[in-house]
Amino acid sequence: MGNLSFFVMMGQVLGASIPPMLLPLVKDMHVSSTKISQLASWGTLCIGLGNVWALPTVAYIGSRYTILIGLAVFTAGFFWQARAQSYESLLAARVIGGLGGGVVEALGPVVVVLLFPREYVARAMSVYTWALGAGAVFGPLITGYAVDNLGSWRYPNYIFGGICALNLLVMILMFPEPLTNIRVAGDPEPSDISIESIDEEQVGEPKEPLEEVGNAQQYETRPASVATFEPCKPGALWFRRSFFLTLRHNHPPPNFFYLVVEPFRILVSPAVIITVLLFGISIAGTIATSILVSITFSQPPWLWTSGQVGLYNIAPLLGLLAGMPFGGAGADWLAERHLRRNGEFKPESALPILLPFAIATPIATTLIGVGFQRGWHWAVVGLFWAILNANLTGGCNVMISYCTESYPKKAIQIGVVVNVIKNVIGFGVSYSTLDWWMKDKYFMFLTVALVIFVLFVAAVPLWISGPSITRKTKTWVGYEEE
């Protein structure tokens, strides 16, 4: 989980590290500040599109190999950026690196579902969503100080590439295939024959092409087998977990393109639609704020250096940390309380956590725009930026936890859809940030705030009638209960 979260965080670093480099890149590449700011947008878009190849590749070669290939491409992208001699080369490096780095975002939710009991899913998911936001903080922070103290925008890319290479090495050694019921030739026979037949069905039986495609990697989201085996040697266990090849034991549907588009069937679920849009608009708001911070505070009367711009990103980091207790432990506490009182687990029991975020987030988003337009003190703008980011680990985390708990066998599909669409939304908003801001000023942030408020209001029916909505939408996507 730690390796995965770190990879996710570095993916956000790719998109967020441009603002402190903006002025040095303008001078070095001889292009406008608008084109340089769009490098962040293209990185965000390609991180999202990189999720698309996650499900098909996992179905064929498994999660471990998929993540290692993606991380290798992602790492090479940073070193390519550091050596780029033209704007076009720099853009190409960010596009290809983003396509490699995006795959891990889709696999985060499914690994959480595999590794943690349902009553701990929100807490574990808050670490994942924190990593999604933390990269947008540490990227500018490290970049700003590296540019100021080392004198070139190239050095941060070498630093990030080295960090990713180290993470790649650690993942090769310590990140196993995460499915929990691997059985191959030579295993001790389980004592219960019926349990053995279940395991063979989960791992060994070929899947029909028209069967639910999420189950092309069905073992990824099924509960672990209850069979108990004799302990084996650590070396043999590591070798099996490290070199287990899915294709030898599970036959995914032959239509690769169908595997690419199949996750988007989950969009018939209102909960997933709300989650996708809430994540996308919230991240778009914080990306737009980051871009405007680098432009506004680098000009008179502030005249901030790249290091000061990077240091300012501590504000959203504090917001992410503030949101975690609400979206993680707070949501789990509500779910556990409902379980104790009623004897059943109900994902909707955590949704009241959304109320404070439904009030605070739209107000803070609007006041960010007002603060930029009226020249408010940087500390005031930073406070509202922190509140906006608290929604990522708070309200957004509650929604993605709700989705994965309501459709546990669709965790990877939910991860793909959420990350693709949120990054496409983030790309669209951030790509047009400067032009939109020059035209509408604070009305830009008011529009974002109103959309966020409407999405929170749209979540109310899920709290009231969530179980019936979930049952209905499960039939639409062909969801089969255990």
Predicted regions and their residues:
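Glycine-rich segments within core transmembrane alpha-helices of 12-TM secondary carriers
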Residues: 120-143, 147-148, 158-167, 171, ...
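Intrinsically disordered, low-complexity terminal tails of fungal membrane proteins
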Residues: 1, 176-259, 335-346, 472-482
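Cytoplasmic helix-loop-helix junction between adjacent transmembrane helices
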Residues: 93-132
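Helix-breaking motifs and short loop linkers at transmembrane-helix boundaries and internal kinks
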Residues: 29-30, 53, 58-62, 83-89, ...
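C-terminal transmembrane bundle
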Residues: 8, 12, 41-48, 55, ...
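C-terminal membrane-cytosol helix-exit motif in multi-pass small-molecule transporters
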Residues: 164-185, 331, 335, 459-463
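Extracytoplasmic
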Residues: 2-33, 49-50, 104, 108, ...
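Juxtamembrane cytosolic amphipathic helices that cap and anchor the N-termini
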Residues: 1-3, 86, 250-282
